[in-house]
């Protein structure tokens, strides 16, 4: 990735006397699709550092970056959810509504089988959990490769507010047995 573009994403710099994001991304069709050695796009970098205005501008110019995955198959939504950047999550979800990709993005899994909700629960970011569940309350949020559902992760870690939110808001939460055939109820009791 162009170091100037990376630095701008890291700092959330949409434009100053030396740099203008729109000009930089529009100058070359490939600019928006440049990646870091880990496969992160400029949108991933903005999500990592919590720059919602920068993310919004990137998506206006290159909306296809919304569903791009890095080398760990993470989208920018996975990264923002993991870091607890609520405003970035809001921007990404708003863009999904504009481009009719809501279900696709919220249901995408990374290399471990985690959705963005798995990441938000594991990192204990309640505001992000609420946004994600509200955005796609019809989804069952199946287990990841370790057999953990978001409901199981919330129960196992004692993240009671997330547990309650998932149970109250998610129309069909997955109660499947997790690791060692323990259900979310087992995990809550053991915790």
List each language-model region with its residue ranges.
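Ankyrin repeat domain, specifically the short helix-to-loop turn at the C-terminus of the second helix
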Residues: 21-29, 57-65, 91-104, 131-139, ...
């Amino acid at each position: 990735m162009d170091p100037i573009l990376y630095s701008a994403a890291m700092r959330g710099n949409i434009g100053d006397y030396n740099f203008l994001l729109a000009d930089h991304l529009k100058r070359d069709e490939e600019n928006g699709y440049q990646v870091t050695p880990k496969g992160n796009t400029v949108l991933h970098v903005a999500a990592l550092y919590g720059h919602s205005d920068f993310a919004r501008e990137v998506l206006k110019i290159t909306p296809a970056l919304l569903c791009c995955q890095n080398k760990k198959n993470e989208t920018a939504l996975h990264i923002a959810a993991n870091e607890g950047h609520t405003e970035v999550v809001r921007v990404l979800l708003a863009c999904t509504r504009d481009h009719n990709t809501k279900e696709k993005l919220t249901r995408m899994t990374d290399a471990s089988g985690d959705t963005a909700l798995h990441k938000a629960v594991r990192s204990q970011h309640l505001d992000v959990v609420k946004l994600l569940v509200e955005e796609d309350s019809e989804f069952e949020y199946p287990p990841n490769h370790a057999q953990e559902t978001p409901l199981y992760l919330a129960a196992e870690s004692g993240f009671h507010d997330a547990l309650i939110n998932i149970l109250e808001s998610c129309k069909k939460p997955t109660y499947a047995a997790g690791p060692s055939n323990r259900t979310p109820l087992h995990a809550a009791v053991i915790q």
